[in-house]
């Protein structure tokens, strides 16, 4: 445990950031999985789930959670599934 006040604050701040980043990444993965399962099942709401998944991927890329090239790769893969 750090003794310096600024280091203590930094530990708190990084823990909060880690929690937010993990939550955002998990939300992205969940949206992608929901879309893939809907495509496999032939559900009616595929378009809405596709838009939600792409939005989650874009948000993760914007916040720096994933690289922009990975975001583009994921979106292309999802669009191929949607067709």
From Swiss-Prot:
Signal peptide: none
Transmembrane regions listed in the UniProt entry: none
UniProt keywords, alphabetically: Ribonucleoprotein, Ribosomal protein, RNA-binding, rRNA-binding
GO biological process: translation
Keyword Transport attributed: no
Protein family according to the UniProt entry: Belongs to the bacterial ribosomal protein bS20 family.
Function: Binds directly to 16S ribosomal RNA.
Identification of the protein by name: Small ribosomal subunit protein bS20
Originating species: Enterococcus faecalis (strain ATCC 700802 / V583)
């Amino acid at each position: 445990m750090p003794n310096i006040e600024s280091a203590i604050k930094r530990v708190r701040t990084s823990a909060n950031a880690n929690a937010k980043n993990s939550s955002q990444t998990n939300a992205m993965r969940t949206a992608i999985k929901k879309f893939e399962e809907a495509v496999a099942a032939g559900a009616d709401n595929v378009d809405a789930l596709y838009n939600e998944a792409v939005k989650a991927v874009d948000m993760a890329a914007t916040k720096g959670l994933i690289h922009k090239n990975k975001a583009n790769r994921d979106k292309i893969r999802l669009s191929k599934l949607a067709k």
